[in-house]
């Protein structure tokens, strides 16, 4: 849509519609390929953020040609077909079929046995039991925010979920927890109360979502934050035997 409103052009990114100044937009020929895009290798679909960075987001869609780039403003609607994301819009107030032993094995598979979260499968399952928050989601969220328990904030503050780690002052403002277990259990409680069971701000749905709905609206500024966590859940589910889907 090339129509302008007061010199601004409507755009859509990660499901959110907004406006930018027309002088900040460059028109691209519809026959030109560019990145970011979505591409299938015949088994999985990847969202390529750049030439060097991509995440696995879905199973191959039969409407897609292998290796051909596809484009979408929300990652779901592709004109003639829709892409099914296994975990991005799934209910996080649910129980994972993975056991504590499965979760511990995942850290080994990911080469993260030297991180602070290794061996904490029982604590993730305890958080799931106590607060009703999906354990696989908690593992994936903490993996993204803390680099599988190896970030400096994780090491120094037992903060594995980016709580209060604001963009301008991530380290200094990040909440500190007494130990690893309280970092997991405390975060699960906080996330549930604020984003999952809550019906007011900042909650926008008990799922990861994108910038239009779900946790991604207010939990993180990054437009593909929800997709990135869902991708980790998807990859983990593949590695551990597809018990959750």
Regions picked out by a protein language model, each given a short descriptive name:
Residues 145:
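Pyridoxal 5′-phosphate
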Residues 4, 8-15, 21-137, 148-245:
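Catalytic cores of secreted/periplasmic lytic hydrolases that degrade extracellular macromolecules
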């Amino acid at each position: 849509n090339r129509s302008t409103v007061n010199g601004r052009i409507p755009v859509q990114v990660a499901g959110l519609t907004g406006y930018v100044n027309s002088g900040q937009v460059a028109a691209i020929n519809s026959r030109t390929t560019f990145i970011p895009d979505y591409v299938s290798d015949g088994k999985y679909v990847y969202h390529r953020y750049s030439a060097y960075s991509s995440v696995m987001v879905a199973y191959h869609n039969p409407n897609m040609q292998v290796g051909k780039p596809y484009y979408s403003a929300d990652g779901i609607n592709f004109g003639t077909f829709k892409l099914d994301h296994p975990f991005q819009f799934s209910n996080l107030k649910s129980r994972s079929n993975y056991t504590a032993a499965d979760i511990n094995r995942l850290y080994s598979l990911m080469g993260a046995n030297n991180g602070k979260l290794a061996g904490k499968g029982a604590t993730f399952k305890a958080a799931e039991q106590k607060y009703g928050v999906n354990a696989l989601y908690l593992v994936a969220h903490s993996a993204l925010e803390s680099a599988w328990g190896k970030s400096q904030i994780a090491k120094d503050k037992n903060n594995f979920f980016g709580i209060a780690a604001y963009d301008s002052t991530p380290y200094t403002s990040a909440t500190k927890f007494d130990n690893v277990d309280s970092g997991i259990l405390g975060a699960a409680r906080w996330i549930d109360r604020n984003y999952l069971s809550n019906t007011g701000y900042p909650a926008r749905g008990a799922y990861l979502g994108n910038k239009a709905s779900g946790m991604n609206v207010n939990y993180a500024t990054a437009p593909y934050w929800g997709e990135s966590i869902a991708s980790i859940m998807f990859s983990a589910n593949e590695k551990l035997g597809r018990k959750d889907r």
